[in-house]
């Protein structure tokens, strides 16, 4: 027979060098009739079958012994639907010829992909089930503009790159091939021939599923349906709502006790979600679950951005996990990593032989801290790949938000680099303008396509406008992690209480920038790894002090303006650092192993969450200055802080923190509203394994000036504790009489100096007028239980502080000079 295919062309196919298979294979018009050509390595016989009549049309001639067939049908002068009946040894199969199908990609999609402005590129690129000419199969598409040849390889073609070379669309750089009869779950990759004639075997960047490491193939999976966000979930993400986030690493929250292996998505959902609900958290934040090759990266070095990791099951299993969380009223946030990717050969690195996804120059494209590659945000197709991925997770799995990892490393070209190791931007500056534009664009897309979605930035610098809308010059995030607050407060809490008075500003400085952004207060996984110790072990002192410090810190954090985030295990004060290879130490909650200390902290966190949600003053005005006021900010000597939180109606809630192991009795401070105040939470309570020192009953304000207020209350502040007071009932006050204001010290604390006669009169008065800074501090600092009896109020105030006789476990202090006083106090008791 006569064919118009040269031997050089045939050799190019078998050598894997031919770049345009559709120009040769399939059905073609010739002067002599319709010709069909087929590349079927190792086939013995090929017959053309008319699909409509099921008649044999002709047998193709084997032009090349390796398996190239061709045949001309003079009786046919127009295209028709056909199948190929192929004999391989003793096996005869009827197959669809992939090269008889027309291009599937729409002109608009092709144009948008070329422009890098496709809203949902994942709907076009990757592997998608579809039907063409009544034939079902999978359409494969890959962006690889600099490759000489791209083939699909997989279970269905013996991983032979000669069998399914793809069609190239020059305008967009996209390769395409529809392969009939490919099944759900089939494994596949793309084989690329680069410009240096090197073969590269790559996973699909847009794959919806992937193999479990160490295997690296992509897996045919179904694209989930779009999920609409409900009004309730949208409301739960708002600035004026209580947001308490439980950060979770799915691989180590809890494991199979028999073999220490991971639980699957369904098993995790059945245990984790009821626990989170019971603990009172409103959101779950998952460490990255996009497929990643190295367990030790915790997911922060992903390769398959569109594939939920197969460590815990299928994409459908992850979808069920999210659905179960929503059914329980819990929103789900995903840690998302668009800042860098690993250099594994099956991934994005030098994808088509060129720096396609990354920068070619290591000064721009190599991350020195993590030995990873940095995305080229200036390339539209790369920006499209990443923005589309954020949208994919939100709308296809119904996620309620994303937390963007390592934003600072993205927006600064000199991040973690010395002089000479980075390239300035076009204006000579250090900002990565392309990355900034990418973040603005992504946040804008998410906000417009799915209003109410929460976008959170882990940004560790003072970059301005992180949570401003893009139209106002900001990055467009809804929240930013307050890394400054976290570092300052943990630095303060690590100190021995005797030294905290010299570092008082570490807890007050945050208010200077509190309202510059919308903040989340993060106690994340980063603070309990790499030798940093657990939160519990960061605390100074003996066992009692460590737990008391941590409880006081949590109480302070939950009352401070900003949404809350706590990494798993910290809710029960796990004693060791987090280990991603093991389950959390749940046994510590057992009374025998944990002595009640850990269960006490767990109970406190549960109560903090419930109090937080119940008291709108603690969250409603987080981002507004009118929601917060320092009542005592300058008592560095006693390491006491007092502030007031308010809701939109102006209703107050007062928070008192004592960061020394010394109880403060008769501690007086001014209040804004006259009335009765009730202690509603005390981190030193018995049920939390505290000493039990409290302010039993209701405390009435008195017309005694303190801290610039005409009304004040006098309380007992437990050692190493935070106490919340709620206004139970307001009281009208007669027209204020003139009150002589006392002098203050240079640092703002109220002066203690009085003349001798005035001091004596104060001591014998039935109505106590002693201010916090005037009260004699209790010097006791022993491990023994010391009975603290508060001074009883006069009979005209029967409801206030009826008694304070609870035993308080008062711990030792580092002050050597306090030992003598402590002994005397113990003896007197």
Swiss-Prot record:
Active site (UniProt): 405, 458
SUPFAM superfamilies, alphabetized: (Trans)glycosidases, E set domains, Glycosyl hydrolase domain
GO biological process: glycogen biosynthetic process
Segments for region (Disordered): 758-829
Compositionally biased intervals (Low complexity): 778-789, 810-820
CDD domains assigned: AmyAc_Glg_BE, E_set_GBE_prok_N
Enzyme Commission number(s): 2.4.1.18
Catalytic activity as recorded in UniProt: Transfers a segment of a (1->4)-alpha-D-glucan chain to a primary hydroxy group in a similar glucan chain
SMART domains the UniProt entry points to: Aamy (SM00642)
Signal peptide: none
Keywords recorded for this protein, A-Z: Carbohydrate metabolism, Glycogen biosynthesis, Glycogen metabolism, Glycosyltransferase, Transferase
Record has Hydrolase as a keyword: no
Gene Ontology molecular function terms on file: 1,4-alpha-glucan branching enzyme activity; cation binding; hydrolase activity, hydrolyzing O-glycosyl compounds
Presence of keyword Glycosyltransferase: yes
Annotated metabolic or biological route of this protein: Glycan biosynthesis; glycogen biosynthesis
GO cellular component: cytosol
Family note: Belongs to the glycosyl hydrolase 13 family. GlgB subfamily.
Record text on subunit structure and interactions: Monomer.
Matching HAMAP family: GlgB
Function as written in the Swiss-Prot or TrEMBL entry: Catalyzes the formation of the alpha-1,6-glucosidic linkages in glycogen by scission of a 1,4-alpha-linked oligosaccharide from growing alpha-1,4-glucan chains and the subsequent attachment of the oligosaccharide to the alpha-1,6 position.
Protein name (Swiss-Prot/TrEMBL): 1,4-alpha-glucan branching enzyme GlgB
Biological source species: Actinobacillus succinogenes (strain ATCC 55618 / DSM 22257 / CCUG 43843 / 130Z)
Gene encoding the protein: glgB
